[in-house]
Amino acid sequence: MELFVISPDLKFNNLTVAPDSTVSDLIDHFTVKNGVSLTDFYVSSNGRLSRSNDLLQSGVVYRLEPRLCGGKGGFGSMLRALGAQIEKTTNREACRDLSGRRLRDVNHEKEMAEWLKKQADREAEKEQRRLERIQRKLAEPKHYFTDTNYEQQCHDLSERLEDSVLKGMQASSSGLVQADEGPSLKRANPTDSKKKAKKKCYWTGMAGLEEMASSSEGSDDSDSEVSPSTSGASCSSGFPKPVVSAHKADPQEQPSSSSPAQRKHNQEELQKRDKEECTSEISSSSSSPAANNEKLNQEETNEISSSSSSPAPKPTEVNQQEMETEMECTAQISSSSSSPAEHSEEEVQQTAERVEKMAEEVQKTAEEVQKKTEESTAEISPSSSIPEEKSQVLSQVEDPLDLLSVSGPEQLEALGLERLKKELMERGMKCGGTLQERAARLFSVKGLTPDQIDPSLLAKPSKGKKK
């Protein structure tokens, strides 16, 4: 029987075998011929594997192929691990269903439908909670008092309160009855000769209240126009006050049992004396303006001499005080002119002219005082506190600086930042820093030539600008 065999070396052989031969006989023939192992080859025909006990057919092509060497393996384990991971995943929202829609969108639609179904239930629960909260707030707290001692104390306190109120009402009613039965002492009889003296007040600043109160009650309308206190204050504010007579003693020294008529008489005398003093001062000041000017000049010199130790008064305050005194004196003159028996209209006009002249003189003197105070303050300047060494250096600012004549950095500090910077730049040194640093740096090169200067003090050469 004749058949065709393709050997492992790709040779096409025509082989004649016995009719009952099998596939194993074919393999033995080639292994014996080539000297290889029987287990290293297998036979296939028409692309199918032939078994070892199959009979050979005539005219069929058989392929003798060697077996491949086995590897390490492991690819199957890798496939098994990957399959396990694929099976473990639970997020399949990125997948699509049969209609092509994302599972994520489908799930969201289902969740939204369920949420809308439960919306009414949620609103009902919310309203129920709100009503319960309101009921809890409106519910009144229930207090149960079971303390017998506390109840007994409250009962005792109420009884004591009633007793104390009754006693107080009885005491007040008895006091009112006694006050009604006694004589009325609200107003004393002025004709009573046995009038008791008032108790003297020794409070500070309250000494003349009794006399002022009694004088205001007994004074007439004409007397109330000009009071002694205002007239005395007006004259004493602008002019030196003369010695007061014995009638102006302390009201505490006078007997409190003096009659109203005597007090009225004393008040009239005081008013007359004050008017006479004011008119005499006005006439004397108008008759001798030169003397007043001399006194004012002396006062100005005294003020200027003391201006270095104490600040000068403001001219506005002086003018205000002088104008107040003038207004008060003119008011007194006008009030005194109301009585035609003492002054005539001509005298009033003369006094008014004199007052105007005095006002002009006072204004002039105030301007002179202001000028002198300004001059004195200008003379006393902080420049006087500068030491002599610094003043010498300041006088030589514009001159070329000679370091050999400088005794210390303190003198160089007086030159200022700009001058020190200029001197340092001329020597090629660093010109930055504070005033003290610049002065110390400049003083450190005293008596040194440019070659002897420390290189750390020199400025770095400036680099040219790149074009």
Swiss-Prot record:
GO CC, one annotated term: cytoplasm
Residue ranges annotated for the SAP domain, each copy included: 412-446
Name used for this protein in its record: Splicing regulator SDE2
InterPro entries assigned: RNA_Proc_DNA_Dmg_Regulator, SDE2-like_dom, SDE2/SF3A3_SAP, Sde2_Ubi
Record remark: domains: The PIP-box (PCNA interacting peptide) motif mediates both the interaction with PCNA and cleavage of the SDE2 precursor by a deubiquitinating enzyme. The SAP domain is necessary for specific binding to DNA.
Biased composition (Low complexity): 225-237, 252-261
Function: Inhibits translesion DNA synthesis by preventing monoubiquitination of PCNA, this is necessary to counteract damage due to ultraviolet light-induced replication stress. SDE2 is cleaved following PCNA binding, and its complete degradation is necessary to allow S-phase progression following DNA damage. Plays a role in pre-mRNA splicing by facilitating excision of relatively short introns featuring weak 3'-splice sites (ss) and high GC content. May recruit CACTIN to the spliceosome.
Localization per Swiss-Prot or TrEMBL: Nucleus; Cytoplasm
Biased composition (Basic and acidic residues): 265-278, 353-375
Location of region: Disordered: 173-199, 212-395
Entry comment on modification after translation: Upon binding to PCNA, the N-terminal UBL (ubiquitin-like) propeptide is cleaved at Gly-71 by an unidentified deubiquitinating enzyme; the resulting mature SDE2 is degraded by the DCX(DTL) complex in a cell cycle- and DNA damage dependent manner.
Entry keyword set: Cell cycle, Cell division, Coiled coil, Cytoplasm, DNA replication, DNA-binding, Mitosis, mRNA processing, mRNA splicing, Nucleus, Ribosome biogenesis, RNA-binding
Pfam family, one: Sde2_N_Ubi_vert
Gene Ontology biological process terms from the UniProt entry: cell division; DNA replication; endonucleolytic cleavage of tricistronic rRNA transcript (SSU-rRNA, 5.8S rRNA, LSU-rRNA); mRNA cis splicing, via spliceosome
Coiled coil (residue ranges): 107-143, 341-381
Family indicated by similarity: Belongs to the SDE2 family.
Origin superkingdom: Eukaryota
Propeptide: 1-71
Motif (PIP-box): 33-46
Example GO molecular function: snoRNA binding
Positions bearing the site annotation: Cleavage: 71-72
